[in-house]
Amino acid sequence: MGFFDDKQDFLEETFAKYPPEGRRAAIMPLLRRVQQEEGWIRPERIEEIARLVGTTPTEVMGVASFYSYYQFVPTGKYHLQVCATLSCKLAGAEELWDYLTETLGIGPGEVTPDGLFSVQKVECLGSCHTAPVIQVNDEPYVECVTRARLEALLAGLRAGKRLEEIELPGKCGHHVHEVEV
């Protein structure tokens, strides 16, 4: 059975947003649905999406592999994405990465034995003014991350708290600051 076999309403709603000849535009929402429900994108899901939108698995994989959001190996319940671009590096992201991987005992593509955590370095998360930044799953960013904030974040996640329930020491927030224009 395919992933989308029992999701016909979702498919109809998604495809209705695009002209019939533009079904390929639905690649992103279909990938996102798989990622949200399964936590990662299996090769057979790439093939299924390609069939549904009328393209090749190579094209679907090309779209999926462009974005760091999509995972191609199983991830932990909490997938920690550490920004690795210059602003975050200058603000201490490398030291946070080292602490994180040593503390959890895992590297990229690995999951902690309890299934809670996986880690990944990602390119710019777009919050250079609050560097260093970590994103947990698809949640708002954890900004101005220090070792103390990272320790509190890990403890809160281990305790089963939602991101917004975790008290982080120091100043900064859980989200990208919105600027009104």
From Swiss-Prot:
Signal peptide: none
Subcellular location, principal: membrane
Coiled-coil segments: none
EC numbers: 7.1.1.-
Record bears the keyword Iron: yes
Keyword annotations: 2Fe-2S, Cell membrane, Disulfide bond, Iron, Iron-sulfur, Membrane, Metal-binding, NAD, Quinone, Translocase
Cofactor binding mode and count: Binds 1 [2Fe-2S] cluster. This [2Fe-2S] cluster is referred to as N1a.
PROSITE patterns for this protein: COMPLEX1_24K
Pfam families xrefs: 2Fe-2S_thioredx
Matches recorded under InterPro entries: NuoE-like, NuoE_dom, NuoE_N, Thioredoxin-like_sf
GO MF entries: 2 iron, 2 sulfur cluster binding; metal ion binding; NADH dehydrogenase activity; quinone binding
Binding of [2Fe-2S] cluster, residues: 83, 87-88, 124, 128
Reactions it catalyzes: a quinone + NADH + 5 H(+)(in) = a quinol + NAD(+) + 4 H(+)(out)
Record GO cellular component, one term: plasma membrane
Necessary cofactors: [2Fe-2S] cluster
Stated role: NDH-1 shuttles electrons from NADH, via FMN and iron-sulfur (Fe-S) centers, to quinones in the respiratory chain. The immediate electron acceptor for the enzyme in this species is menaquinone. Couples the redox reaction to proton translocation (for every two electrons transferred, four hydrogen ions are translocated across the cytoplasmic membrane), and thus conserves the redox energy in a proton gradient required for the synthesis of ATP.
Record-linked PANTHER family: NADH DEHYDROGENASE [UBIQUINONE] FLAVOPROTEIN 2, MITOCHONDRIAL (PTHR10371:SF3), NADH DEHYDROGENASE UBIQUINONE FLAVOPROTEIN 2, MITOCHONDRIAL (PTHR10371)
Domain statement: The subunit can be divided into two domains: an N-terminal four-helical bundle (residues 2 to 74) involved in interactions with subunits Nqo1 and Nqo3, and a thioredoxin-like C-terminal domain (residues 75 to 180) that coordinates the binuclear cluster N1a.
Family classification: Belongs to the complex I 24 kDa subunit family.
Quaternary structure, from the entry: NDH-1 is composed of 15 different subunits, Nqo1 to Nqo15. The complex has a L-shaped structure, with the hydrophobic arm (subunits Nqo7, Nqo8 and Nqo10 to Nqo14) embedded in the membrane and the hydrophilic peripheral arm (subunits Nqo1 to Nqo6, Nqo9 and Nqo15) protruding into the bacterial cytoplasm. The hydrophilic domain contains all the redox centers.
Stated name of the protein: NADH-quinone oxidoreductase subunit 2
